Structures are given as structure tokens and as C-alpha cells.
């Protein structure tokens, strides 16, 4: 039998859910199989993320990605022609070495990641397996999903500084049953907001973006929506927040400028404690401190780790080295996993491996600038990721991930069930 190799790698410039250019890559194998992947991009980005190569200049507001596209079509294509598509680590290593920079700044993480993902898709097709099975083998589970239903911070033009208010099902059940609870709560939330006189326009991730005065008001609306949908807050549906505290951290004075208050690290913890006391169904907080405020993050972790999932995003940027540093320092107890923060499938898997080794939960994540690509849905199942956040049950680029999970659950049958945080009987 003739050995299957990579025959061609081709990229093009497409557009994401915010109308910004992004990279699409197609990897064609010698047997004619084609794998395609589309690269997302974030609005709220960490300082240590791999470099998303943009063109600059006047075209498309400087956001064009033709430099990254050309890097795929020339340097990366030349490097990978004839390579083994089934050896993902070797493919990714070759691109990392070809780039030669610590942050993928020469070729662009968007160029490298698109190729990395498309290679995995092509390899799965060539072996006649679903992507989740190719990447994960037989060790699979459906993820617990977190849905951003009220948007603030960088994701919406309103008065709320905390970036995301999410709802998540917390009773062990099928994915479909849990998702239906989320959909019911989402539609009820719209009614609650309308009755209170708020606009119900949508933010980048499909959640509502009401012009509320503070985060407490947003949490009250969520609590009411959960109850009015017929569920018990904390027992059926819980709440999670992505604070994205770097958004309201002032580097000049080292204080947090949050909803009209100027707070130091201890005062910020007191602010969060007030919310946690009022809303016991709040079970998870992401980036509660700035990515450079190690002292604040560590202190908050030590005092809250038994009560709360503390998710590290900007603090680690899906980077194995930064994660190991955070673990050593005692920061957080969960890792947010974004493929485009680090730039290859292999490095992302390594970050997940390190997280699991040290008892950290993992939450696979979309970006605010998304496409219809469903790679992360398969990836969450394949990696036993436990958790996945990919927006509200609205906007096709978000819902398509959930529809893919419905298909996967149907294929897996009744054997695989959600593994919830916190564990529920």
C-alpha cells in the first residue's frame, strides 16, 4: 500500500463572526483527502499569547491576514510536503522550528494553528474516523458546557466591567437534556430583561448586553431567570463568571477600577466575597486578578480554592511553561484551554496533560471572533476536557459547536455522560 503523505497545504483569507479577516487552511493528502480548519481570534487577549500575524496598513483596517496566508502557501507548504499527516507532534514541531521564534511571530500563530488543525482533520478523514475518535481514541466523555448569556467588558458596549456571566447545567444527565435546560433559561432571561426595560441586543458571543449598572444586577437577573425557567439555582443550573480582570486593572496605580470603585487586591477579594455570599450558585470565576498580579491571584486561590473553581486564562495563555509556573506558585485550580493562544494542537494537548497531572480542571474555550468550524467540540470530547465554553445558544458560529456535540452524543450512545464540576449525583 502506498504511504499517505501531505501533498499540499493551502490557505486563504476568510472572515470571522465579527467581520474581521482570519485564516482558513486546507491540507490535501496524497490519497485526495482534504482537511479544512478555520482559525478564531480573541478581543480580550493575554500578553503572553502566541502572535496572531496581521498585515497592518490601510486595507481592512490593518487586520488583513495575507501575510499569514502567504506564509502557509510558501514556507509551510514547502516544509510539510511529503510529511506524515498521522504524526501530529512531528508536524507541529517542524512548523515551530521553521518559525524559530518563542511566540510564533515570524510565520504567525494563525498560520501555524490553521495548518495544525487542518492536518488533524485530514488524518481523521483518511483513517475513516470522526475527529474526536482520531484525537481521543476510546477515552471519551461529553463536556459540561458553560454558556455566556450576559456580556460585559470587552465583549459588549455597556456598563458592566466583568466580561462574561455564564450558566451551566450541574446535574449529571445527557448533554441534550442539559443543553435544553440552558436554552430554556436563555429564553426566559430575555423575557426577564425585557420586563426590566433593558435592550436585548446580542454581544459578540451571543449573550445579551444590557446596559446594567453593575455585576450584581446581572447576577440577580440570571438568578431570576433560572428560577422562572423552573430550575433550582445551584442544583439544576449554576453560574460562572469570566472576570477578565485585566480589563479593569490599572497598571499605573496597581488598582482595580471596577464599576466606579478603586480597589486594591484585598478589597477586590472582598467585592467578590460579597457576590459569592449573595449568589451561592456562583461556582467558577475566570481571571479574577490581572495576569501580572501573581500575589493577588495566589492569595485569592488559597482562600477560595475549596469553594470555587478559579480558572486561569490570561495568566497562562495555554502555555505549558506558564502553567507549570502558576502551579508552582499556587495560582488557580483550573486551566482555560484556547488552541490559538499557543498555536498548535500538540502544545495544547501538553497543557491539558500538565493540568490533569496536577489536579487542575480544564475548560476548552472558543474565542469572541469565531467561525463555523466545530473543531473545539470534537477536541473537548477527545480530550475528556470536562468543560467547554463556546458562547450562548444563539448566533450560528456558537450554536454549530453545540449541534456538533448533539451529533457526537448520538454517535457515542448512552455510555458516555457528563462529568460535572462540582460533582452531582
Curated annotation (Swiss-Prot):
UniProt family annotation: Belongs to the enolase family.
Coiled coil spans: none
Gene3D superfamilies associated with the record: Enolase-like C-terminal domain, Enolase-like, N-terminal domain
Active site: 205 (proton donor), 338 (proton acceptor)
Entry note: cofactor: Binds a second Mg(2+) ion via substrate during catalysis.
Example of a GO biological process term: glycolytic process
Protein name: Enolase
One cellular-component annotation, GO: cell surface
GO molecular function list: magnesium ion binding; phosphopyruvate hydratase activity
Its job: Catalyzes the reversible conversion of 2-phosphoglycerate (2-PG) into phosphoenolpyruvate (PEP). It is essential for the degradation of carbohydrates via glycolysis.
Binding of Mg(2+), residues: 242, 286, 313
Subcellular location as annotated: Cytoplasm; Secreted; Cell surface
Amino acid at each position: 500500500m502506498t504511504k499517505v503523505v501531505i501533498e499540499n497545504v493551502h490557505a486563504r483569507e476568510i472572515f470571522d463572526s465579527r467581520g474581521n479577516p482570519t485564516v482558513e487552511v486546507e491540507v490535501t493528502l496524497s490519497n485526495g483527502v482534504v482537511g479544512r480548519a478555520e482559525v478564531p481570534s480573541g478581543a480580550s487577549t493575554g500578553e503572553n499569547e502566541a502572535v496572531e500575524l496581521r498585515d497592518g496598513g490601510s486595507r481592512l483596517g490593518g487586520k488583513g491576514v495575507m501575510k499569514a496566508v502567504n506564509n502557509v502557501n510558501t514556507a509551510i507548504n514547502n516544509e510539510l510536503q511529503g510529511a506524515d499527516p498521522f504524526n501530529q507532534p512531528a508536524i507541529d514541531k517542524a512548523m515551530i522550528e521553521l518559525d524559530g521564534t518563542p511566540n510564533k511571530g515570524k510565520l504567525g500563530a494563525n498560520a501555524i494553528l490553521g495548518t495544525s488543525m487542518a492536518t488533524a482533520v485530514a488524518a481523521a478523514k483518511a483513517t475513516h474516523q470522526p475527529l474526536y475518535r482520531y484525537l481521543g481514541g476510546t477515552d471519551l466523555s461529553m463536556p459540561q458546557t458553560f454558556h455566556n448569556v450576559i456580556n460585559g467588558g470587552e465583549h459588549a458596549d455597556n456598563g458592566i466591567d466583568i466580561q462574561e456571566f455564564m450558566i451551566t447545567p450541574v446535574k449529571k444527565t445527557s448533554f441534550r437534556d442539559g443543553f435544553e435546560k440552558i436554552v430554556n433559561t436563555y429564553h426566559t432571561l430575555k423575557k426577564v430583561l425585557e420586563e426590566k426595560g433593558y435592550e436585548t441586543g446580542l454581544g459578540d458571543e451571543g449573550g445579551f448586553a444590557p446596559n446594567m449598572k453593575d455585576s450584581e444586577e446581572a447576577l440577580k437577573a440570571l438568578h431570576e431567570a433560572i428560577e422562572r425557567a423552573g430550575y433550582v439555582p445551584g442544583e439544576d443550573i449554576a453560574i460562572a463568571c469570566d472576570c477578565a480582570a485585566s480589563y479593569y486593572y490599572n497598571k499605573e496605580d496597581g488598582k482595580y477600577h471596577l464599576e466606579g470603585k478603586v480597589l486594591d487586591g484585598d478589597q477586590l477579594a472582598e467585592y467578590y466575597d460579597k457576590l459569592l455570599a449573595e449568589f451561592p450558585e456562583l461556582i467558577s470565576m475566570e481571571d479574577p486578578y490581572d495576569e501580572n498580579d501573581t500575589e493577588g491571584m495566589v492569595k485569592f486561590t488559597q482562600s477560595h480554592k475549596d469553594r470555587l473553581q478559579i480558572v486561569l486564562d490570561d495568566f497562562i495563555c495555554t502555555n505549558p511553561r506558564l502553567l507549570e509556573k502558576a502551579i508552582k506558585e499556587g495560582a488557580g485550580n483550573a486551566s482555560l484551554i484556547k488552541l490559538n493562544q499557543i498555536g498548535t494542537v500538540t502544545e495544547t494537548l501538553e497543557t491539558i496533560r500538565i493540568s490533569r497531572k496536577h489536579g487542575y480542571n480544564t475548560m476548552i474555550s472558543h474565542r469572541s471572533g469565531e467561525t463555523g468550524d466545530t473543531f473545539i467540540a470534537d477536541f473537548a470530547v477527545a480530550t475528556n476536557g470536562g468543560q467547554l465554553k463556546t458562547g450562548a445558544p444563539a448566533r450560528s458560529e456558537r450554536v454549530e459547536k453545540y449541534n456538533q456535540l448533539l451529533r457526537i452524543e448520538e454517535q457515542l450512545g448512552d455510555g458516555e455522560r457528563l462529568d460535572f464540576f462540582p460533582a452531582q449525583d
